[in-house]
Every structure is written in structure tokens, then in C-alpha cells.
């Protein structure tokens, strides 16, 4: 079974490409069905976040070109648009890549924990669509185990830094005393939950949470003494807030330039701080052209995030060692499973030959053959049958100069020990 990973991330592709390659929840069922058909893979999983889209495939090692064409077609892109930003990992490199992603070593924010939850969600979604089998299931479980060891045995998770944390950190550049500011959070997912927590820790006391589902908005808002509203109510409240941070799975922008312009007039040009964490973007890019609006995307957060990376570099080196060990453990598991499978087939073949020769001997006995003659014929026939195919392959290997085959045979049957123990002609006499 070959493992192939294809993807783009914040290092290889700008947000303009990433948002077009992101998978929306509404199209996941369609994506799984088409992906497996296009790739010929027996197992598949899809990870789609604001910073990366990755496809994990178990099956044909040559599926990368067909998957690239499918990915471009599914998102209505030219293949050329993706070729220069797409990376491909195979087999052990793909295993290492997944483990590094899960541990946060490949994230924009080194060591950030959210990606592990997102990877678990991707695995659950693949299982929900019956897209995984024993191979990917074993890989995901091993990956989660390694990520847990990285989290508990290194300092990679200390000094919390994330896209959510970086967003709040940047707000301090605009507002020195954030206790005077009111925040509007658009969305109610895990990232927005983190944003709300960091804003509260930074001193923000007034919250609005807007979401497509009012109940979710209210639940998150009430946890921080705020108010939940529907997305359609945002224009009514926009002029009252100073900070807008958005992270939804909407395929279309939620906040447009016109709505912000009208709110600015009511605010008498008091500044807005906005961060659009979503991919595809929730806030129209044209909003950035407005005076008194400071709009940032996930790519703009890179500088803030890089300042925090240095504190985690030592822990990252320790994490890499744990991951190397995890990769080796997984490969050892696969080899052990392959050995079990091979031995099972080997035994089945031997038992089949035994049954054939036993039936011959029984027929001979029923026909009146002397029992000793029948037994000797059974032993001779079974020996010949068991040794015929290995003998043919050994002769072929020797003719081709592949001496390692005979070395393997000598090791399997301990022939050197047998030769050493065999008595000489004189001893036999």
C-alpha cells in the first residue's frame, strides 16, 4: 500500500490561492466521491483549514498527476495555477509530514495546538464518508499518539501563540487600553473561541458574537458577558464596535466595503481594527482601502507570529526527534503486518499442497497400496511440491547474479548450521 500526500499551505501559496482551494462543508460528500474515483485510491482523507489544504491517499503511488487535475477541476482552476504551489510527499516522507503537521511543526505558528483538533476532525469526516480503511486509520491513530507525546514531553505548547493570539497581539498596536473597546467576533468555531478568550485576557469587556446560528453565537457570547446576534444583524451593530475578527466557513464574503463605509460615517472616522482569519475571506479585500480601517489577513499575521517562533525552536528540535521515532515505529508496524500477511499466505499454500498429497495417499490406500509405500510417496510428493517453486526461483536468481536470495534461503533454513552439524563420511561409517 502506497501513501501519497498532496497539498498547499501558507508557505507555498498566498491566501488568494488557498481560499480558492479550500473545501466547504457543503461539498465534502461530493469531494470524497470524486477524489477516490479520480485517484483510484482505496482510502482518502481531506484536511482543509485557513492555512492549508491537504489530501491523504492510500493506493496507487502514481495518483499524484490525476489528483492534481481533479483538484484544479473541482475548484475551477487551471492546473498551472496549482503546479507551482503544490507539494507531494510519498510513503515515509508522507508519514513524517502528517506527524509534523499534527504536532504543529509545520504551522504558521510553531507548535500551535489547533491543527491537531482540525486533523482529528478531518479523520472523523473521512470515516463518516466511509473513505478510510485500516491503513489510514492506523496512520491517523499513530499520528495522534505522537502528537500527544510531543505536547506532553516538550515545551512546544508553552507561551501560547496562535493565529488567534497573534490577532489580539496586533490589536494592541492600534488600541493601547483595550478595556475601552468593543469587539465583534464573526463565527463561533474553535478559532473564534480562542480569540474571545485572548481578548478577554487583554482587557476587552464588551463582546458581540455574530453567527449563522443564533444559539451558538449566544452560547459563546454569554461565556464572556457578551451578546449573540445573527450574521444579518451585523450592519446594525457595526458602528458600535472597534475590533472585528472573523473566522467562518462561508464561501462568500460576509462583510462588504459598503457596510463598513456607512459604519465609518457614524463613527466619525474612529479607527477600526479588523482581522480576517477565514479562507475564503469573510471581509472584502477592498475594505483595506478605506481610511481609518486597519484590515489584516492571516498572511499579515506572519511577522507577529515569527517573533514567537524563536522561543519554541529548542522544543521543536526535541519534537523532531520524537517524530522520527514515531515514523520508525509506524514503518515497523507496517513491516510486521506485511510479515503476518505473507506468512498467512505461505501457510495457506503449504496446507493446500498438504491436502492434495494427503488425498492422493488416501486414494492409494483405498486402492490397496501398501501403507509404507503410500506414506513414502506422500512424504516424497510433499517434499517435492514444497521445494519446487523455491528451487526454481533460487536458480533464476543465481543466473541473474542476485546472490542475496541464496543468502536469505540459507538464513531462513539455517543451512550453515546444518552443514556444520552434518557428520563426515568417516563418522557415518
Swiss-Prot record:
Site described as Important for activity, positions?
A: 97
Sorted alphabetically, the Gene Ontology BP terms of this entry are: protoporphyrinogen IX biosynthetic process from glutamate
Any idea of its EC number?
Answer: 1.2.1.70
| InterPro entries in the record | 4pyrrol_synth_GluRdtase, 4pyrrol_synth_GluRdtase_dimer, 4pyrrol_synth_GluRdtase_N, GluRdtase_CS, GluRdtase_dimer_dom_sf, GluRdtase_N_sf, NAD(P)-bd_dom_sf, Shikm_DH/Glu-tRNA_Rdtase
Q: Name one GO molecular function term.
A: glutamyl-tRNA reductase activity
The cross-references to NCBIfam families, in alphabetical order and at most eight, read: hemA
PANTHER family per the UniProt record, alphabetical: GLUTAMYL-TRNA REDUCTASE
What is the additional note? During catalysis, the active site Cys acts as a nucleophile attacking the alpha-carbonyl group of tRNA-bound glutamate with the formation of a thioester intermediate between enzyme and glutamate, and the concomitant release of tRNA(Glu). The thioester intermediate is finally reduced by direct hydride transfer from NADPH, to form the product GSA.
* Descriptive protein name: Glutamyl-tRNA reductase
Species per Swiss-Prot/TrEMBL record = Marinobacter nauticus (strain ATCC 700491 / DSM 11845 / VT8) (Marinobacter aquaeolei)
Organism lineage: Bacteria, Pseudomonadati, Pseudomonadota, Gammaproteobacteria, Pseudomonadales
Amino acid at each position: 500500500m502506497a501513501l501519497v500526500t498532496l497539498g498547499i499551505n501558507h508557505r507555498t501559496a498566498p491566501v488568494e490561492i488557498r481560499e480558492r482551494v479550500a473545501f466547504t462543508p457543503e461539498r465534502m460528500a461530493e469531494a470524497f466521491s470524486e477524489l477516490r474515483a479520480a485517484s483510484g485510491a482505496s482510502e482518502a482523507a481531506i484536511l482543509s483549514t485557513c492555512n492549508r489544504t491537504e489530501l491523504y491517499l492510500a493506493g496507487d503511488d502514481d495518483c499524484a498527476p490525476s489528483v492534481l487535475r481533479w483538484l484544479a477541476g473541482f475548484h475551477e482552476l487551471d492546473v498551472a495555477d496549482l503546479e507551482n504551489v503544490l507539494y507531494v510527499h510519498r510513503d515515509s516522507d508522507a508519514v513524517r509530514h502528517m506527524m509534523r503537521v499534527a504536532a504543529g511543526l509545520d504551522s504558521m505558528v510553531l507548535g500551535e495546538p489547533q491543527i491537531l483538533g482540525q486533523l482529528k476532525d478531518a479523520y472523523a469526516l473521512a470515516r463518516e464518508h466511509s473513505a478510510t480503511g485500516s491503513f489510514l486509520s492506523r496512520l491517523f491513530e499513530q499520528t495522534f499518539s505522537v502528537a500527544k507525546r510531543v505536547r506532553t514531553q516538550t515545551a512546544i505548547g508553552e507561551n501560547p501563540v496562535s493565529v488567534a493570539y497573534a490577532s489580539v497581539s496586533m490589536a494592541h498596536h492600534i488600541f493601547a487600553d483595550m478595556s475601552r473597546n468593543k469587539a465583534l467576533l464573526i463565527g463561533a468555531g474553535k478559532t473564534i473561541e480562542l480569540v474571545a478568550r485572548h481578548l478577554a485576557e487583554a482587557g476587552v469587556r464588551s463582546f458581540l458574537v455574530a453567527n449563522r446560528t443564533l444559539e451558538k453565537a449566544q452560547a459563546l457570547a454569554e461565556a464572556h458577558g457578551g451578546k449573540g446576534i445573527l450574521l444579518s444583524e451585523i450592519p446594525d451593530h457595526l458602528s458600535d464596535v472597534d475590533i472585528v475578527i472573523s473566522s467562518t466557513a462561508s464561501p462568500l464574503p460576509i462583510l462588504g466595503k459598503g457596510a463598513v463605509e456607512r459604519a465609518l460615517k457614524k463613527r466619525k472616522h474612529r479607527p477600526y481594527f479588523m482581522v480576517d482569519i477565514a479562507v475564503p475571506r469573510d471581509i472584502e479585500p477592498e475594505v483595506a482601502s478605506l481610511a481609518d480601517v486597519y484590515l489584516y489577513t492571516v498572511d499579515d499575521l506572519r511577522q507577529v507570529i515569527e517573533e514567537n517562533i524563536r522561543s519554541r525552536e529548542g522544543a521543536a528540535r526535541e519534537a523532531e526527534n520524537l517524530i522520527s521515532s514515531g515514523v520508525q515505529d509506524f514503518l515497523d508496524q507496517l513491516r510486521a503486518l506485511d510479515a503476518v500477511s505473507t506468512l498467512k499466505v505461505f501457510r495457506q499454500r503449504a496446507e493446500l499442497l498438504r491436502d492434495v498429497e494427503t488425498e492422493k495417499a488416501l486414494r492409494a490406500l483405498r486402492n490397496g497400496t501398501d501403507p509404507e509405500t503410500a506414506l513414502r510417496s506422500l512424504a516424497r510428493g510433499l517434499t517435492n511440491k514444497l521445494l519446487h517453486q523455491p528451487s526454481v526461483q533460487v536458480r533464476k536468481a543465481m543466473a541473474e547474479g542476485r546472490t542475496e536470495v541464496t543468502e536469505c534461503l540459507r538464513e531462513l533454513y539455517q543451512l550453515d548450521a546444518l552443514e556444520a552439524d552434518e557428520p563426515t563420511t568417516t563418522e557415518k561409517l
